[in-house]
């Protein structure tokens, strides 16, 4: 969206636009056709089943579960100023719990964070390696680790969650415009 706002991308109306989900069309409409959604990623977390069992910890099912003192130093997540994943986490908590409630949630979660990372996927990768128990991540990142054979359980929290829409754009003045149109 930022590239569209800054005039770096050009409008394109794909003949396939009518086949897309509403969430994919929304960025297209909002930018006058300068970007289109290509994936939707829901926020959540994943945990290492083996570490959880070894430490005798209950399986978390909700965002609020992560505030329990049993998870002190068991959670890794990215830092909001360096990671879109963490920024989405902060924004999601505000949307779920209200402004004061969201910031209070983040303060409570901070008490259980072992480490903040620059990358949004670092926490779940560390959980896959057995270095941390829980990683806050877009759920597809946890699923990727699970289907790769790691003992990871992906969680879509019970309270609901936020999400991102990844989008694609054609750069203004693209050298391979026809190829770009086919991709979009």
Task: Tell what function each PLM region has.
Residues 1-131:
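Extracytoplasmic ligand-binding site segments that recognize negatively charged/polar headgroups
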Residues 1-2, 128, 133-151:
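A ligand-binding cleft/hinge motif common to bilobed small-molecule-binding domains
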Residues 62-69, 167-184:
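Bilobed periplasmic-binding protein/Venus flytrap-like ligand-binding cleft at the lobe interface
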Residues 71-75, 130-133, 150-152, 178-181:
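Loop/turn elements at helix/coil->beta-strand transitions in domains of secreted/extracellular proteins
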Residues 78-80, 138-140, 157-158:
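Active-site-proximal beta-strand/loop segments in catalytic clefts of secreted hydrolases
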Residues 105-110, 116-117, 148-177:
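Periplasmic-binding protein-like
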Residues 123-124, 140-144, 159-162:
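Short, catalytically relevant binding-site loops at active-site mouths
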